[in-house]
Amino acid sequence: MIPREVIEEIKEKVDIVEVISEYVNLTRVGSSYRALCPFHSETNPSFYVHPGLKIYHCFGCGASGDVIKFLQEMEGISFQEALERLAKRAGIDLSLYRTEGTSEYGKYIRLYEETWKRYVKELEKSKEAKDYLKSRGFSEEDIAKFGFGYVPKRSSISIEVAEGMNITLEELVRYGIALKKGDRFVDRFEGRIVVPIKNDSGHIVAFGGRALGNEEPKYLNSPETRYFSKKKTLFLFDEAKKVAKEVGFFVITEGYFDALAFRKDGIPTAVAVLGASLSREAILKLSAYSKNVILCFDNDKAGFRATLKSLEDLLDYEFNVLVATPSPYKDPDELFQKEGEGSLKKMLKNSRSFEYFLVTAGEVFFDRNSPAGVRSYLSFLKGWVQKMRRKGYLKHIENLVNEVSSSLQIPENQILNFFESDRSNTMPVHETKSSKVYDEGRGLAYLFLNYEDLREKILELDLEVLEDKNAREFFKRVSLGEDLNKVIENFPKELKDWIFETIESIPPPKDPEKFLGDLSEKLKIRRIERRIAEIDDMIKKASNDEERRLLLSMKVDLLRKIKRR
């Protein structure tokens, strides 16, 4: 059996527009493509292909589906045959999955399944582990229902299971279930309570672990493997998708204990992200079942950032988004533990449309007691307004303008004029001095964080000439080549705040490459200007006319270089 994740990977890698254009003549219309329908006779085109959603739809005959179904219908072939063709096109080898019992995938999921069964038995024997779960509000029935297990310290359970399956220790490490400590192999999750993480087909492909004491990290997920990708996996999605169409929405949370709290409170469509925020790959999964979501992340700055990042991508895919905040508690799990049954349902009923959250987030991240702070706050919101306008969220813009006007005590028409202006320095507040919303440092940091393919080029630039000390410190730290998320996690608060303000205050460039080129050019000019300043100092200190003439000549050459640029 071919796992759902692999099928989704094939659809992600294959360009649906490219495939369909081999059969019909597609014409671009906005963000979609249009053609005469290949499935029925018509004179006016009503067949549309949406590359962002990776689907096609005909408004005439109702034909619709993904790239696999299109190939099936056009060629009259089976699902398996269509998948084989597209897999070849995507460069994905399906031979690993053809016989589940003997394939590597089959071996992998059987290993996780058998190891999990042993972990469940260990939990039954551990009073400490059961007491911890009960302290978190889980009954005996909950513990069994959610599949909790426990891995004793210095455990070698997975090694014993692997030996019985003729799986080598090297494979065990590669599968992410064990690791080597010194000269011995141990279970990766030793000393932790674990919960199974399943793929879309309901097979266990990873574990989530929680330390019983104060050990760090407190939470630990399995590492990425060939069959487990954090950005492609949502905790509890395999169950939530079955009822999502009936319920009508998903609840997106930040951790598995939060998702389980929602389940205990009778919300069957709660899922948890396994990364910092909701990924685009996960959003595509959700869109197949419902385009209505309620975001409910932690009630702190990190949770707000995750909400903003998730919201940005959800709007790109034209979702209907509400935001719920577990105030005054830190997360949904704590709210449920403190307030009890019905508390999470009540919170969801009080959730508000995303534009109100944007206003609140801006108030949290920007100091609105100064003109500069108000500028940053409004620039942050302006970027969102531009996105909302492009996606047709016009009523939401109206709500946002009204909310900001009330908050800042500035007339709505002035707020709206600022949001619609081309230049961010037309501030609807009094300022004695104008300033740029961002400089080269912020611009380069924005590109570095959002465009992975540009990072190498950015690090090759003359970054020492950046005037912003935060920008210099940022690039000094990220240039070490370590995992970006881990590096940022260790940043001091001031630098983290600077990064967030940078991300949120700069609108996405239409052409990132050109934007980088412009910023690079500014750095070159800045380097020349520094050299000119150095020469001016040398001229003042020159001991004779000959030396002064030489220095002046050098200065003139540099000024010409600037002029030519």
From Swiss-Prot:
Reactions catalysed according to its record: ssDNA + n NTP = ssDNA/pppN(pN)n-1 hybrid + (n-1) diphosphate
A single MF term (Gene Ontology): zinc ion binding
Domain Toprim: 248-329
Keyword Flavoprotein: no
Residues that coordinate or bind Mg(2+) 1: E254, D298
UniProt KW Lyase keyword: no
CDD domains for this protein: TOPRIM_DnaG_primases (cd03364)
Chain positions recorded as Mg(2+) 2 binding sites: D298, D300
Cofactor, how bound (note): Binds 1 zinc ion per monomer.
InterPro entries linked: DNA_primase_core_N_sf (IPR037068), DNA_primase_DnaG (IPR006295), DNA_primase_Znf_CHC2 (IPR036977), DnaG_bac (IPR030846), DNAG_N (IPR013264), DnaG_primase (IPR050219), TOPRIM_DnaG_bac (IPR034151), TOPRIM_dom (IPR006171)
EC number from the UniProt entry: 2.7.7.101
Pfam family, one: Zn_ribbon_DnaG
Known function: RNA polymerase that catalyzes the synthesis of short RNA molecules used as primers for DNA polymerase during DNA replication.
Family: Belongs to the DnaG primase family.
Domain topic, free-text comment: Contains an N-terminal zinc-binding domain, a central core domain that contains the primase activity, and a C-terminal DnaB-binding domain.
SUBUNIT field: Monomer. Interacts with DnaB.
Protein's name in the database: DNA primase
Primary gene name: dnaG
